[in-house]
Amino acid sequence: MSVSGPLPRIPAEAGAALFTDARTAYSFADTPVDDATLTGIWELARWAPTAANTQPMRVLYVRTAEGKERLLPHLDEGNRPKSASAPVVAVLAVDHRFHEHLPHVLPVRPEMKEYFEGEPAQREAITSFNGPLQAGYFILAVRALGLAAGPMAGFDPAGIDKEFFADSDWHSILVVNIGHPAGPPAFDRMPRLAHEHALDWA
């Protein structure tokens, strides 16, 4: 596809699947999610923009009984049944050693690897902004592949990091339950702000 000139719009039904018709899932069917689909989520999400193409987000897929046993105690009590019912739980993290990949992902500026090595505050700034940005892309990629996402912030990051990432520089930022919904939403969709309350013009 050419990136010059007018770009095509996605069909209305695709926009609905990603945004207006999509709902957060709180319980899930037993239908498994295969490796190809989970890999496909990343294959979509990785193309969205990040600052200097740094791509600091990483994903841990938890789906075995053993993995769930390790994860659930670190979730807020009210969130545990949601993750227990999901066939897959994605722990989204940021890699504070993201700069080691810069010669590959930013070949026009390979020297930035050495710059970030000596600037831990700048690495923190990159991960704190771009990690959550990529998390948003990840949720949309889940929906694009016909699955429901249930993002949750109610967990103990330090506990998850100690349990799963003790030997790495990954640090958890979000937990996302993934699968097919077990049934209709438990409550009506909540309102969103109308443009009159959210937009300004200059």
From Swiss-Prot:
EC number: 1.-.-.-
Organism, scientific name: Streptomyces coelicolor (strain ATCC BAA-471 / A3(2) / M145)
InterPro entries, sorted: Nitroreductase, Nitroreductase-like, Nitroreductase_HadB/RutE, RutE-like
GO molecular function: oxidoreductase activity
Keywords: Flavoprotein, FMN, NAD, NADP, Oxidoreductase
EC supergroup of this enzyme: oxidoreductase
Protein name: Putative NADH dehydrogenase/NAD(P)H nitroreductase SCO7141
Family to which the UniProt record says this protein belongs: Belongs to the nitroreductase family. HadB/RutE subfamily.
Keyword Coiled coil: no
Listed cofactors: FMN
